[in-house]
Each structure stands twice: as structure tokens, then as C-alpha cells.
Amino acid sequence: MDYRIEKLSAETIRHLVPLYKAAFHQKVSYKFLLKKYDTRSVGPEFIGFIAYTSEGLAVAFYGVIPCFFQLNGKKVIAAQSADTMTHPQHRKKGLFQNLALKTYALAAEQRIQLVFGFPNQDSYPGFMKLKWQFLPDQLQVFTIKAANFSYSRLLYRTPGLFSIYNMLLNGLLSVEHPDASFFGEKISDGVIRDDTFCLYKKYNATHLITIDKVKAWIKVDGKLKIGAVQGLNENNAAGFIQRLTSIASRLGCRDVIFMTSKYSLLYEVLKKTLTPRDAFPIGFLPLQSEKVSMADASFEYCDADFF
């Protein structure tokens, strides 16, 4: 079968709505996707390609999200590998590889230095074929059970009800979002969490809460996910985790989830009381020069496109 390939744009992105449902059995809005791929504040925008059948049906997509990135101590533009989707009836036809290569070529033309990402077990083999490089340590996840039953998850799967639930969350929790001062000085390589980053991340519904002078950037989508924390240390960690778990239970979340790079400050604090496990590989593909090292890069949950 022949496929027509078109670049992602503010117009064509609406075709991802039915494709998203067919590929992932999840409903997303055109508005959500538009905000996610609108990265004008960084420079390059709508970096990705869609494959169509001769009848005009969108059946595959691959896209990356440009961001400011610290690489070897210097500020550059990188891009995070984001949505990878293929309609179930059009898989194993080479569409992922084709769209990815076109996307990387476009990104290179836009002077994007590298693509990075956290592929799951299903997409990992495909990225290996694309000659991605992977760090020796994966992202680490810490999971705390908060309740035996998650009504938040049930609501999350019902868009109409979850909208009402989100309105209630906005009433119970702060609708404040973090700014650059929340993160402090950038020391390690990785995503630069400046005001541009913080404004962009508003495409997802998140909240900023304070527990005993510790601030946490959270997302509630059936689970309570911690994007980043400020002020956490060995002395207050136990009390913070206990209060956070209680909040998660009241919000109907079964689990509290932290995710961070190994050897980060957050990792060092959490591992004293919680047991980590591997979450996702950390991979990258240089686009401008093969002499790229990500050995000193560190990531938090908030850096991922799924937070």
C-alpha cells in the first residue's frame, strides 16, 4: 500500500485525534495536541510527520518536541521524542522508521542538536534500529501505595466525569504553576527548566502544593505523579511522604509515583526509605555531531512529555 506523508502543522494535527484513539484507545482533544506541539517559544514548531492512506485516513505519526537543553554546560536546542503511533491495521509496514527518519532530517535542518527520549518496552527495539544511543542507567521510579481502590482512575477513563473531577481538584488544590525559581540553578546537563519551559508545560493539568515547607509539582491522572520537588531533604522526607500519601488517598489515587535519574538529589533522598526500580531507558540520537555525550544528563518526571 502506498502512503502519503505530510508534515505536522496546526491544520493537520487535528487528524491525530482519531488516530490517537485507534492506536491507544484514549481520547485526546485537538486543543491539547495543538498546545503540546506548539513550541514557537523555543523556535522550531510542529516537528513531525503523518502518514495517510490514499483515502486520506491518518494511520501513523511520529513527532518530537523542541526544548532548550543544557549539553556539556552549554545551552542548545534539543527535541524530546514524543508520540509514536500507528493504526493497528497498518503496523509492520515500516511507517515508524520512515516517519522517524523524516522527522530527524527536519529537526537537523532546524539546527536541533539532538533528539532524546524515554522509550517504553514496545518502542525500544525500533529506536535501536534507528541507532539511538542509551545511557547505562534507566530512569528510576519510586512507587508508594496510597489506597486499595482508585476512583480517580475510573474518572480519568471517562472524559466528561474527569473534567468535573479536575474542576474539583482546582478547588481543592492550588492552580499555581511553578516558575524558573522553583528549580534553582541548573547544574547537570538536561532540560532547561526556565520560564519558557514552565509556561509550555501548562498544556497538561498540574498543581503546585506545599507540605511542611516542601513544594511539590504534581499531576493527578488516576495516580498522583510528582514532577519535581523543592526543599526536600533527609530530615523532612518521611513526614512529606506520609502527608503526600494521605493526600493521594483522599483524592482517590491508588499510587504515588516519583521518577528521577539515578544519582540525582531526589534519588539520593528517596532511596533511604523507598526501593527504586527501573522505569524507562534514557536514549538519544545526535543530529549535528557524533561527538555528543549525555553522561552527565539528569532528568525528572516533569521533563517527560507524559507529565
Over which residues does each language-model region extend?
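Conserved acetyl-CoA-binding loop-helix of GNAT-fold acetyltransferases
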Residues: 86, 91-105, 235-246
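Basic, Lys/Arg-rich alpha-helical nucleic-acid-recognition elements, primarily the DNA-binding modules
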Residues: 38, 46, 63-66, 72, ...
